[in-house]
């Protein structure tokens, strides 16, 4: 894309308009000076669209949405980008829909659940000349950019890292698609992929992937990267929140400790989707090659045999029955 392209008002469609993350995409489309012309969701609780693009056409059935997008293309008003906020297991099919309609794709994580699906998508990219970009907002977080630069300047140094992310979810979670491993990829994929992607980006490619716990509500293991040994713990169980966090009535705890130093990145997320869109529109978004190692890592976690709980493991594992 040339610099002049960035000044053109791009036409977007959005799949998954009723989802939690969709408003961030609507805001990013608006704040980058572009237009949402069509949206899809089987659920019709989408009044949020009025806050951003009240003139956008809305559909609850994919077939009618498909017909509309095709009609726009044939009449010379084709969609330039399709933003995908649908359930994880549908991303692959919705990306293919986008590419077949000659549109670039902006996709929430995970791009796909299985790494081999990336191969087919790259083939379709080559056939259509359209690109697939994934939102990897942690790569744009100032504190994590600073950490990445610090690690790069340090040369061959190795790091000990503890990553903990507990985001409590209610009973609804297990009854939704998120509680179905075949649809969400499980806890490590659904709430952890953005962290694994960031860790790989900062500390280099994975060398070993050890899984100690892989339950419906939590997962834990050790990920050995080129320049770090990462003990990680992910959970949607409120009982796994630190006591101090529970006393405050909070439902989320996020921590990353690098060589004994806490890296604070809990704040600063407000405009990272908009920053991601700016990069994508400038042609510098994160493509399929850049998401591959993260997708491979969580796929390995999903299918791994559990390692014995001996030696080095995340401290929070001690509170689990498996220890």
Task: Annotate each language-model stretch with its function.
Residues 89, 112-171:
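A contiguous active-site-proximal alpha/beta segment in oxidoreductase catalytic domains
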Residues 171-241, 292-296, 320:
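Rossmann-like dinucleotide-binding domain that binds NAD(P)(H)
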Residues 36, 55, 78-82, 155-158:
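Local beta-strand N-terminus motif with an aromatic residue
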Residues 25, 57-123:
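Beta-loop-alpha module in the N-terminal Rossmann-like domain of NAD(P)-dependent dehydrogenases
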Residues 211-302:
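NAD(P)-dinucleotide binding in Rossmann-like oxidoreductases
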Residues 1-55:
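N-terminal Rossmann-like dinucleotide-binding module
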Residues 1-7, 71-73, 81-83, 278-323:
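C-terminal helix-rich "cap/oligomerization" subdomain common to oxidoreductases
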């Amino acid at each position: 894309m040339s610099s002049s392209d960035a000044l053109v008002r791009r036409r977007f469609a959005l799949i998954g308009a009723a989802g939690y993350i969709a408003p961030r995409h609507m805001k990013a489309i608006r704040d980058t000076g572009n237009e949402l012309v069509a949206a899809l969701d089987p659920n019709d609780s989408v009044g949020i669209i009025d806050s951003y693009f009240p003139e956008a056409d809305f559909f609850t059935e994919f077939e009618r949405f498909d017909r509309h997008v095709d009609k726009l293309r044939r009449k010379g008003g084709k969609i330039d980008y399709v933003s995908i906020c649908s359930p994880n297991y549908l991303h692959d099919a919705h990306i293919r829909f986008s590419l077949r309609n000659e549109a670039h794709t902006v996709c929430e994580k995970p791009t796909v659940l299985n790494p081999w699906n990336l191969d087919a998508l790259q083939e379709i990219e080559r056939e259509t000349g359209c690109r697939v970009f994934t939102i990897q907002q942690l790569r744009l977080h100032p504190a994590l950019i600073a950490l990445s630069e610090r690690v790069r300047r340090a040369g061959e140094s190795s790091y000990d890292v503890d990553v903990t992310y507990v985001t409590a979810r209610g009973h609804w979670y297990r009854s939704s698609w998120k509680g179905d491993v075949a649809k969400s990829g499980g806890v490590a994929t659904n709430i952890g992929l953005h962290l694994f992607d960031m860790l790989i980006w900062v500390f280099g490619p994975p060398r070993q992937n050890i899984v100690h716990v892989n339950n419906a509500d939590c997962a834990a293991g050790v990920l050995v990267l080129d320049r770090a040994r990462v003990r990680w713990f992910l959970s949607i169980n409120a009982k796994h929140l630190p006591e101090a966090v529970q006393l405050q009535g909070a439902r989320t705890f996020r921590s990353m400790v690098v060589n004994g130093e806490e890296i604070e990145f809990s704040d600063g997320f407000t405009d990272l989707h908009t920053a991601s869109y700016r990069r994508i529109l400038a042609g510098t978004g994160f493509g399929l090659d850049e998401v591959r190692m993260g997708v491979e890592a969580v796929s390995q976690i999903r299918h791994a045999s559990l390692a014995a709980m001996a030696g080095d493991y995340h401290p929070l594992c001690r509170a689990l029955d498996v220890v």
